[in-house]
Amino acid sequence: MRILFLLFSLTFYLPGYSQRSETVYRTKGDSIQNYYKVLIPDTVSKGLLVIIGGFCGTPIDVMQETKLPETAVKAGYTVVIPYLVDDCSTIDSKNLYQTRLESVIPEVIKSYNIPKDKFIIGGQSLGGHRAMFYTEQAYKANNEKIIKPNAVFGVDPPLNMKRLWDTFTYLLRINFSEISIEESREQLRRFRIMYGGSPSQFPKNYEVASSYYPDAKDGGNAKYLKSVPVRLYCDPDINWIIENRRGSYATMNATDLSGCISQLKLLGNKNAEFVTCLGKGFKPDGTRHPHYFSMLDPEEFILWANKLLEIK
C-alpha cells in the first residue's frame, strides 16, 4: 500500500532565527517512527542535505549532538532529519529503512521545491552506514526512482558488518566494560535475527548488508561509489579505546573507514576522503567520547558542500 505523504505535520519557527521547521508524520496515528523533521531556509533552497542519526537517534538527538543542521539551513540548504524505523523497539530485518528512505527523498524534493541535482546525504554511526548503503543502491540500480546523491558522508559509521560481529564477540568475551557488554549482547542478538547467524555461517548475508566488505572483490557494495564524492569522519583515539573499552584498532570503526577510502582510491575515486578528527568527539554534556557527531566541523562542511555543488 502506498504511504500517503504529509498525512500530518507540525510547523513552527526555530528559536533564534527565522527559518521554519516542520515535522512530517508519514503513517497516520504513528508519531514514534516513519517521520522526519524538515528545516526550511528563508530563501530559495540551494539544495538538500539529509542527515541520519545513529542507533535510536531521533531528529532531536541529532540537533543536540551537532550544529550541522542549523548551520546548513542558515547557509540556504533544506535539511531533512529522518527517523524512519524505531530501532529501539524493532529489528529492521527486511531493510524497511532503505525502502522508506527511497520514497522520502523524491517526495521532499517535490514538496519543498528543492533543486534535483543538489543533494548530499550522510549521518553518524548507523546513520552513516545507512547513508552509504542508500547511495550505493542508488548508483547500483538502474532505477530513476532512487534519487542519486551528489555526495555522501559518514561520521564514524560501522561499514563492515562482519568486523562489527567480531568486535561485539570480542567485547563480550573480555567482559570489561558494562556498557560494551550490554551493547554487544543486544547487537549480537539482533545480528542473528537480521542475518541468520554468524558471518561464518552466512557470509553472503553479511556481505550484502555491508556498505564496505573487504573480503569481497572491490570492497563489495563500496564499488558503486567509485565515482561519488565520499567523506568519512573519524576520531581515531586509540588510547581512549584502550582505557575505556580494552579494545584495539581492529575493534574501531576506523579500520573500516580507512579501508573503504583506500579501496575507493584504488578504484580511481579522487574525491574519497578520510577526515581525521582526533580529540574532537564529545557528548552533548561535554563528556569525551570519540563516537559522536560533534567531531564534524559544520562550517568547514558547508564550505566543502558549496564547492562540491557549485553553490555560491
Task: Cite the ranges covered by each PLM segment.
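Bacterial Sec-dependent N-terminal signal peptides
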Residues: 1-20
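N-terminal cap/lid segment of alpha/beta-hydrolase-fold proteins
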Residues: 18-43
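Short substrate-entry loop that stabilizes the transition state in hydrolases
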Residues: 44-46, 51-90, 242
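Alpha/beta-hydrolase active-site loop
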Residues: 92-113, 133
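Primarily recognizes the serine-hydrolase "nucleophile elbow" in alpha/beta-hydrolase
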Residues: 110-111, 116-175
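The alpha/beta-hydrolase serine catalytic core
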Residues: 166-214
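Serine-hydrolase catalytic core
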Residues: 193-273
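Catalytic active-site module of serine/aspartate enzymes centered on a nucleophile-bearing elbow/loop
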Residues: 287-312
